[in-house]
């Protein structure tokens, strides 16, 4: 028996556009000598004493196992021939605005998720084109023809499936998921690839024996709600390709943060501050990607006994600079009373966007 009725609106035409290795692709475009070489956007660990985090990298670097959010030190160990570029984020933002203008030729119902990806609702569009697939192809063509960059596109009847579709074939892919194909498309998929299902939820699902979309289909709705609360309702529908969330052109993000749970508890100040430095870099990357600056830095600490402490500090000027975020996080930590307890989680968030 269903707790909530299944309502599946299959009339919409949603496109998800995701630029391919965006920052790195812009650098290769602007410097053809980089073509064919592994390019890593992030500080060179040979110049920073091993500090820093990879913002993104091109597909040549990914062949060596390099990926975003990896430490620059590990990226260098995996790919010593990689070319490290600190990045020109003002340039990336300018190109992102050019891409946004291309989207606007087709629809005003655009929900940017970051500087390099967005949802578009083209059910009703400016050119009166009935085929969302045709519009997706036109957008890909425009981006390549005008900016010499590639984008992957996913087309479906909701945002959840469009996002999954755009990730399915990269780079420069175009994947379509029709209503009658949704369950079959999702069935063999690793549950960790379901958009919106985080690591903690994946762990819980694995404990339940759920590893794929097909496994999730077998779980009763009430069981999922008992285990996950309201999110169980969403999981039950995701497995069936149901998601009626609208494309919100006025979507407002109020904060950006990163956190990490540690299998081995942190005790030493050196280890704790090292982790805060890495988190600051990741937060900066995310702020740049979303073109945000904030005035308030929030430090979150969860101790071994699962008690949680949250403390914040406001700045005079909004920032997205990793050094400012790192310095403020260290200041907040230093202001705390000495705690002999081990730390199992650290989090850094920037809010108070200008």
Curated annotation (Swiss-Prot):
Can you tell which superkingdom this protein's organism belongs to? Bacteria
Q: Which NCBIfam families match?
A: PRK02406.1, PRK14133.1
Give me the comment on cofactor binding. Binds 2 magnesium ions per subunit.
What this protein catalyses is:
DNA(n) + a 2'-deoxyribonucleoside 5'-triphosphate = DNA(n+1) + diphosphate
Site positions (Substrate discrimination) are: 23
Q: What does this protein do?
A: Poorly processive, error-prone DNA polymerase involved in untargeted mutagenesis. Copies undamaged DNA at stalled replication forks, which arise in vivo from mismatched or misaligned primer ends. These misaligned primers can be extended by PolIV. Exhibits no 3'-5' exonuclease (proofreading) activity. May be involved in translesional synthesis, in conjunction with the beta clamp from PolIII.
Source species, please? Streptococcus gordonii (strain Challis / ATCC 35105 / BCRC 15272 / CH1 / DL1 / V288)
Q: Which lineage ranks, top first, belong to the organism behind this chain?
A: Bacteria, Bacillati, Bacillota, Bacilli, Lactobacillales
Q: What class of enzyme is it?
A: transferase
Q: What's an example Gene Ontology biological process for this entry?
A: SOS response
Please identify the protein, giving its name as recorded: DNA polymerase IV
- Asked if Zinc-finger is a keyword of the record, the answer is no
The cofactors required by this protein are: Mg(2+)
């Amino acid at each position: 028996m269903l707790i909530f009725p299944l309502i599946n609106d299959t009339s919409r035409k949603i496109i998800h556009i995701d630029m391919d290795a965006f920052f790195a692709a812009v650098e290769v475009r602007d410097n053809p000598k980089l073509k064919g070489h592994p390019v890593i956007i992030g500080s060179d660990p040979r110049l920073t004493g091993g500090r820093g985090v990879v913002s993104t990298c091109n597909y040549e670097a990914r062949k060596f196992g390099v990926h975003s959010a990896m430490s620059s030190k590990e990226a260098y160990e995996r790919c010593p021939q990689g070319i490290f570029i600190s990045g020109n984020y003002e340039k990336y933002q300018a190109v992102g605005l050019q891409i946004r203008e291309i989207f606007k030729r087709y629809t005003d119902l655009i929900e940017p998720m970051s500087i390099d990806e967005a949802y578009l609702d083209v059910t009703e569009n400016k050119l009166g084109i009935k085929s969302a697939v045709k519009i997706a192809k036109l957008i890909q063509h425009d981006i390549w023809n005008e900016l010499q960059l590639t984008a992957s596109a996913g087309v479906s009847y909701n945002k959840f499936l469009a996002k999954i579709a755009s990730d399915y074939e990269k780079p420069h892919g175009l994947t379509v998921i029709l209503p009658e194909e949704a369950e079959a498309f999702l069935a063999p998929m690793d549950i960790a690839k379901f958009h919106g299902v985080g690591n903690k939820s994946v762990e819980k699902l694995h404990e339940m024996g759920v590893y794929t979309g097909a496994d999730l289909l077998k779980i009763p709705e009430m069981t999922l709600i008992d285990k996950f609360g309201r999110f169980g309702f969403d999981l039950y529908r995701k497995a069936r390709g149901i998601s009626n969330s609208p494309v919100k052109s006025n979507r407002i993000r109020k904060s950006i943060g990163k956190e990490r749970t540690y299998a081995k508890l942190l005790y030493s100040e050196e280890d704790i501050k090292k982790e805060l430095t890495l988190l600051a870099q990741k937060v900066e990357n995310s702020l740049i990607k979303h073109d945000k600056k904030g005035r308030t830095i929030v430090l979150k600490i969860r101790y071994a006994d699962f008690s949680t402490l949250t403390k914040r500090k406001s700045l005079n000027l909004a920032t997205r600079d990793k050094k400012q975020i790192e310095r403020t996080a260290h200041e907040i930590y230093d202001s705390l009373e000495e705690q002999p307890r081990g730390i199992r989680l650290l989090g850094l968030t920037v809010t108070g966007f200008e």
